[in-house]
Amino acid sequence: MTVFAEPAYHTEFIDAREIQKPLPKNLHAFIQSFLLQWCGRELPKQYRVVSELNVICGHDRLVPDVVVIPRSARFADGDLVDPAMLAIEIMSPGQTLSDLLDRCERLVKAGTPVCWIIWPERRKAWTYTSEETLKEGSEALRMMLMDEPLDLSLSEMWAELPE
């Protein structure tokens, strides 16, 4: 098992290197706040929505912006060791779509079935799945929980952003 140094805020461990995650700005924060509220309202009770949680992905430690996890999820030293049901990455200044795709690929390979990528400045969003497909959302982003679809309306989310 890989041993990690005590993490600093927003520090990830990728490919045996510590990487400082960019700190979010206002649009990122608005979207993250909306997603936490939306998930808290829409998720069945056997799931939790958590922000900025360390997630172990093989030899990496990532910090997705938001994750949905079963209440029965296992932790080691406060880090999530079970796959999330959904990981959400919100683009921050200094990040690229390629950066977020790489992170989603690592999360999916570690067992997370779906990852959403959200780019607030461009009002664009994508779903990345375990089939290694990237699909741009036009009206909604979908996740499946207990064989039931849960759809996030993009227009509802974009309405949280200033014009």
List PLM regions with ranges.
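Gly/Pro/Ser/Thr-rich low-complexity, intrinsically disordered segments predominantly at protein N-termini
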Residues: 1-163
